[in-house]
Amino acid sequence: MPLIPMVVEQSNRGERAYDIYSRLLKDRIIFLGSAMDDEVANLIVAQLLFLESEDPEKDINFYINSPGGVVTAGMAVYDTMQYIKPDVATVCIGQAASMGALLLAAGAKGKRFSLPNSRIMIHQPLGGAQGQASDIKIQANEILRMKEVLSGILSKHTGQNFDKISEDTDRDFFMSGDQAKEYGLVDHVVASRDELEKAEAAKEK
């Protein structure tokens, strides 16, 4: 089990200790720093819904450093990002691959960021099947359906046409931050907090 840092804050009522993720949540920051599975997705969905209930008008900042993961788990987070009222600003630090890249692209338009040395990768969904031939066929058809769904989502958020997305995701397709900006996965490549805040302020005008 990874060690989770604790933050101690002083107040009029004395000291209060938070784990680092809870403290970030107070500032409307969600951090995905692992592969995506059902447990991780449920935590992120819960945080998104909580922050919406706290203030439906204030942006949520979603930092992503993820190699991807389970498609259905990632789709739960994606759908929640689109469902809630606040804009979700996304920031790639390290890498956003597979479902991580899709979530990065799904941020509010004009509020999708990459740090300069981040790596972004898109590809088609992975899957395996075993059992009777009819079961394998069902699983194969489902993977093909999910590939179409994911390609459609990437097309919607990047502005690339569906056929290009399908072609590019046929194999692992790696991009730098600048290349991801050109592709339409992010809107800005920023090296500092000041640059990010300036870009956000310009979007609000």
From Swiss-Prot:
<keyword id="KW-0720">Serine protease</keyword>
<keyword id="KW-0963">Cytoplasm</keyword>
<dbReference type="GO" id="GO:0004252">
    <property type="term" value="F:serine-type endopeptidase activity"/>
</dbReference>
<dbReference type="GO" id="GO:0051117">
    <property type="term" value="F:ATPase binding"/>
</dbReference>
<dbReference type="GO" id="GO:0009368">
    <property type="term" value="C:endopeptidase Clp complex"/>
</dbReference>
<comment type="subunit">
    <text>Fourteen ClpP subunits assemble into 2 heptameric rings which stack back to back to give a disk-like structure with a central cavity, resembling the structure of eukaryotic proteasomes.</text>
</comment>
<dbReference type="InterPro" id="IPR018215">
    <property type="entry name" value="ClpP_Ser_AS"/>
</dbReference>
<dbReference type="Pfam" id="PF00574">
    <property type="entry name" value="CLP_protease"/>
</dbReference>
<comment type="similarity">
    <text>Belongs to the peptidase S14 family.</text>
</comment>
<dbReference type="GO" id="GO:0005737">
    <property type="term" value="C:cytoplasm"/>
</dbReference>
<feature type="active site" description="Nucleophile">
    <location>
        <position position="98"/>
    </location>
</feature>
<dbReference type="InterPro" id="IPR029045">
    <property type="entry name" value="ClpP/crotonase-like_dom_sf"/>
</dbReference>
<dbReference type="GO" id="GO:0006515">
    <property type="term" value="P:protein quality control for misfolded or incompletely synthesized proteins"/>
</dbReference>
<dbReference type="InterPro" id="IPR023562">
    <property type="entry name" value="ClpP/TepA"/>
</dbReference>
<dbReference type="InterPro" id="IPR033135">
    <property type="entry name" value="ClpP_His_AS"/>
</dbReference>
<keyword id="KW-0378">Hydrolase</keyword>
<comment type="function">
    <text>Cleaves peptides in various proteins in a process that requires ATP hydrolysis. Has a chymotrypsin-like activity. Plays a major role in the degradation of misfolded proteins.</text>
</comment>
<feature type="active site">
    <location>
        <position position="123"/>
    </location>
</feature>
<keyword id="KW-0645">Protease</keyword>
<dbReference type="GO" id="GO:0004176">
    <property type="term" value="F:ATP-dependent peptidase activity"/>
</dbReference>
<protein>
    <recommendedName>
        <fullName>ATP-dependent Clp protease proteolytic subunit</fullName>
        <ecNumber>3.4.21.92</ecNumber>
    </recommendedName>
</protein>
<dbReference type="InterPro" id="IPR001907">
    <property type="entry name" value="ClpP"/>
</dbReference>
